[in-house]
């Protein structure tokens, strides 16, 4: 067991809660102690929903362990069914309740409820949230469709079926959930995009789907796997049992959206889409070819998040914006293989870890100019003084905007372009201010044109301001006890001319060179010599 202050994923029963909360007419009875009810806050505070998740907790206490906890489970099952009258009932247990081994799913199956009852067994000590969501969605679809044998679905999934029936092709969008990254907006964007290409959306699941909608899944011509972490297992099962093909391209970015449309048109035997549609619909291709984008070319970027968004971000950064990807990783071990493959194409070794300290150390070692990650990478990047944009869950409430802000499709590419480029542009402004801070116009004590109304800092305020803007002088005092070389005012002035997002790396390299060369004081010449040494 490992103690930590941060985790990228919750236990698997939180993933089951995401599926139940995303759907309509589904209720989840969770065998759990009172302390495990914290997950409600994820939906009301982070997702900002106006209602609590449809979950009933058994909330057993220590004194209940001396009695029959199975009867406690049965009582809560009856109460939940009588009160909520769900169309389908999910039954599971939290990580703590798993130790009691009451098997609430088996208990519920034998109580004779007149609705589908799906028992969810999630290994809490070996799997995590995304796997729990995937397994819950898979078991729910399988449990509901098991009442409808595949030969009775009455649908042929040959590409020519929709043509012979004289209708438009229809697809299922599988994978979006609550607490996913911009899932609701992604669905709206894809529904609009597919409609423009003559393709109807048949069922969206699990988000806002009902159990009856899951019964209609086989009536579509193919499935679109939007989020492999959640929907790939279900898509594979539908392919095996109903012969339903599914798309494997996630349409995040201009190039991926183009490939996604080509894949759908090919699977459905439709005419090929317009290859120039991306340039017409999205501003990202135009900007990446403009003169202004030269500032972005070759920028070093570090990427970490869930597998789907990390892989998509790496492709956009490398192929569409001209960035240099210096780090790529994920916390999702289920997506380790495709992330490793994507990293190998970029000449990198993927970072597969759920230890935020290891991620921060890798980030500092890579010395990027932009970080694309989760909420935790935003905190780590702030400590390192690096611009950051959030591209993946886990996220904070500020990453759940009330406005329309998709990640998929042509409009999603525009949103991504804004989210990634703006931190770099603001970083450029900060660097320019730092470069010209000591010029005549920026001197703090310079008299205002308003005469006596102009501000005048006291000597103490000036010292505090200098300490805040130039923390390196204070760090020299602290590090002198470690026999580090001392920075002269000339050396500090030269260091201040270097962009802030690589200044830390330059400082470390210069001090390392000074130790090797036996220099006790670092001046401007030492900075130049270190630069030549490490470039050689």
UniProtKB/Swiss-Prot annotation:
Record EC number: 1.3.7.7
One Pfam family per UniProt: PCP_red
Residue ranges the record marks as coiled coil: none
Reactions listed under catalytic activity: chlorophyllide a + oxidized 2[4Fe-4S]-[ferredoxin] + 2 ADP + 2 phosphate = protochlorophyllide a + reduced 2[4Fe-4S]-[ferredoxin] + 2 ATP + 2 H2O
Composition skew (Polar residues), residue ranges: 470-483
Low complexity bias spans: 448-469
Region named Disordered: 447-489
Pathway stated in the Swiss-Prot or TrEMBL entry: Porphyrin-containing compound metabolism; chlorophyll biosynthesis (light-independent)
Binding site for [4Fe-4S] cluster: 36
Cofactor(s) required, per the database record: [4Fe-4S] cluster
Keywords for this protein: 4Fe-4S, ATP-binding, Chlorophyll biosynthesis, Iron, Iron-sulfur, Metal-binding, Nucleotide-binding, Oxidoreductase, Photosynthesis
GO biological process: light-independent chlorophyll biosynthetic process; photosynthesis, dark reaction
Record has Iron-sulfur as a keyword: yes
Binding residues for substrate: 427-428
Superkingdom of the source species: Bacteria
Cofactor mode of binding and number, as noted: Binds 1 [4Fe-4S] cluster per heterodimer. The cluster is bound at the heterodimer interface by residues from both subunits.
Subunit structure, as described in the record: Protochlorophyllide reductase is composed of three subunits; ChlL, ChlN and ChlB. Forms a heterotetramer of two ChlB and two ChlN subunits.
Assigned protein family: Belongs to the ChlB/BchB/BchZ family.
Protein name: Light-independent protochlorophyllide reductase subunit B
Species this protein is from: Prochlorococcus marinus (strain MIT 9303)
Lineage: Bacteria, Bacillati, Cyanobacteriota, Cyanophyceae, Synechococcales
